[in-house]
Amino acid sequence: MNYKFFIIAKKIEPFYQEAIEEYFKRLQRFCSISLSICKNSKKLPVKDLEKSYKILITPQGKTISSEKFALKIKDLEMKSITDITFLIGEGIEIFDEIFTISQMKMSKGLIATLLAEQLYRAYKILRNEPYHK
């Protein structure tokens, strides 16, 4: 499975970047994953995104439990969807599904960190592995 995180922001704080990289490192044994930061939604590589299943992360999205998120990942894999793009930010009009991390407003770096953690947790759930060491 290939995942892309696109964050619509001028920048994210270095401590969020470090946390995201830590989860990406943990996820490498399960999937391929990358992060891109775009200053505005008009700079998204729309042509590249056409082939990908796009999940918009916004406070207006639907809530989903960790277990249901894991099942969603499994369901997409079963449907032979190999590319999933998570879009974090405003002004995004192309997506297949909308989720929320929280209905509270928070920084995009924090949202990406929490999403990376939940993706890692999803793989641990799907493999019946303990999450905490």
UniProtKB/Swiss-Prot annotation:
Gene3D superfamilies: 3.40.1280.10
Predominant location category: cytoplasm
The organism's place on the tree of life at top rank: Bacteria
Swiss-Prot/TrEMBL catalytic activity: pseudouridine(1915) in 23S rRNA + S-adenosyl-L-methionine = N(3)-methylpseudouridine(1915) in 23S rRNA + S-adenosyl-L-homocysteine + H(+)
Keyword Amino-acid biosynthesis assigned: no
GO annotation, cellular component aspect: cytoplasm
Localization annotation: Cytoplasm
Chain residues that bind S-adenosyl-L-methionine: I57, G89, I101, S102, Q103, M104, K105, M106
A Pfam family hit: SPOUT_MTase
GO molecular function, one term: rRNA (pseudouridine-N3-)-methyltransferase activity
Disulfide bonds: none
Record EC number: 2.1.1.177
Keywords, comma-separated and alphabetical: Cytoplasm, Methyltransferase, rRNA processing, S-adenosyl-L-methionine, Transferase
Coiled coil: none
Entries under HAMAP family matching the protein: 23SrRNA_methyltr_H (MF_00658)
The family this protein is said to belong to: Belongs to the RNA methyltransferase RlmH family.
Biological function: Specifically methylates the pseudouridine at position 1915 (m3Psi1915) in 23S rRNA.
Quaternary structure (record): Homodimer.
This protein's name: Ribosomal RNA large subunit methyltransferase H 1
Protein's organism: Caldanaerobacter subterraneus subsp. tengcongensis (strain DSM 15242 / JCM 11007 / NBRC 100824 / MB4) (Thermoanaerobacter tengcongensis)
Gene: rlmH1
